[in-house]
């Protein structure tokens, strides 16, 4: 079993969530009582990963600080006997988990962001998890499905893995996947035959699959990233590098289990907030009642 590191690219400026993200990193926007990035780290840790690399930007100090120890806050909570809150704060970065930071100086695309992590990851296989797509842990056990299953399959086969989901409507804003065989059941796997970032004419592709921001990548991806020219929006795209890799070796797509929310966009963020809010143990029942009252006004 390989000791894989996970890379989370958090250097993006969160354009879809402006003006909220003008001064607050998108990844720190709360979903009930935890910032978005915390759900991502929790998912990675549940998959058995102990080393996480955040690719940050000068404006993302809040993300770095979130995972640092706050001795003053912990001391205050201890003095006030807020044991539950203290435990929650201390578990933000679980024991045995290391979170490192590297900087992306220029916004040259997701592929470039991943390359910025290479000095820390080394010429080794690794994981990429995008910070704004949250997989609902109530609909899929993170200890068994999705990223955890992708890691297990990579350890078994050595083949790169990409998580996919079905998407209705316009796919021109997404990374579209076409597979050799149909993915007709959650967790099913098939080889990728085409992978296109934000296709101009998605209707010409015989596919309704899009990438869900989870990748387990073989070490061969590094060479492809180095060779990748700027693509969609003039950026170096991870999708383009994976597409080239898929021409040379098998790259698998795995159909996602459960539900996901694109919290980098307003609708997905609002859906996730409501879903997690309704499940909140302390306030969920009152929140549900409040929503029902609003809907009947």
UniProtKB/Swiss-Prot annotation:
Molecular function (GO) terms for this protein are:
enzyme regulator activity; UTP:glucose-1-phosphate uridylyltransferase activity
What SUPFAM superfamilies does this protein's entry cite? Nucleotide-diphospho-sugar transferases
Catalysis performed (reactions): alpha-D-glucose 1-phosphate + UTP + H(+) = UDP-alpha-D-glucose + diphosphate
> Which principal EC class is assigned to this enzyme?
transferase
Q: Kindly indicate whether the keyword Cell division belongs to this entry.
A: no
Q: What is its EC number?
A: 2.7.7.9
What does the entry give for GO biological process? lipopolysaccharide biosynthetic process; UDP-alpha-D-glucose metabolic process
Which residues fall in a coiled-coil region? none
Pathway linked to the protein: Carbohydrate metabolism; nucleotide-sugar metabolism; Bacterial outer membrane biogenesis; lipopolysaccharide biosynthesis
- What keyword terms does UniProt attach to this protein? Lipopolysaccharide biosynthesis, Nucleotidyltransferase, Transferase
Gene3D superfamilies (UniProt xref): Spore Coat Polysaccharide Biosynthesis Protein SpsA, Chain A
Biological role = May play a role in stationary phase survival.
Which NCBIfam families is this protein grouped with?
galF, PRK10122.1
Which family does this protein fall into? Answer: Belongs to the UDPGP type 2 family.
**Protein name per its UniProtKB record:** UTP--glucose-1-phosphate uridylyltransferase
